[in-house]
A protein has these predicted regions:
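A conserved regulatory-domain signal marking ACT and ACT-like small-molecule sensing domains
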Residues: 1-156
Length: 156
């Protein structure tokens, strides 16, 4: 989590820069926005598991933070360094796939995961400056199975 305030990303990236750790991919999401969407989904289904006051307290607290996910060239060192200066960091296994930048390839990957019974917890991606390919990061329910499906990490 990252404090939702001006300059916080600069502080975090300064720490990584000073340790010669490169960020290769990153996603930042407003924690409050995410939780509000979840709250609204729960309202529609009627499956709230806690009193309304509990949800409202969490929403109020979440307004102070953003969720940040990033890939570095040295994840273990990044976790150690950031934890040592007070950030709460968790290492997660993800799979990175390079897709040719054309319609339908992300669908092919998503369909392959679904057909194999692999759930996608989250994904984020962006095109490379060459305009030919894009990198997508996936957090999936069955990492080993996903790696077997796409062993070279390139989808053409």
């Amino acid at each position: 989590m990252l404090a939702d305030a001006p300059g916080e990303l600069a502080k975090l990236t300064e720490i990584l820069k000073n340790e010669h750790i490169n960020i290769e991919a990153m996603n930042i999401q407003d924690a409050n926005e995410y939780l509000m969407a979840l709250y609204e989904c729960r309202s529609q289904t009627g499956r709230r598991v806690a009193p309304r006051d509990y949800y409202e307290a969490i929403l109020k607290e979440s307004a102070k933070y953003s969720m940040i996910r990033f890939i570095t060239d040295n994840p273990d060192k990044a976790v150690d360094v950031l934890n040592s200066v007070g950030y709460k960091v968790k290492l997660e296994n993800v799979i990175g796939l390079v897709l040719q930048n054309r319609p339908g390839l992300l669908n092919r990957v998503a369909k392959a995961f679904g057909d194999a019974g692999i759930n996608i917890a989250y994904t984020y991606g962006a095109g490379f400056s060459d305009g030919v390919s894009a990198l997508f990061i996936f957090k999936v329910s069955e990492m080993e199975k996903a790696l077997e499906m796409f062993p070279n990490g390139i989808i053409e």
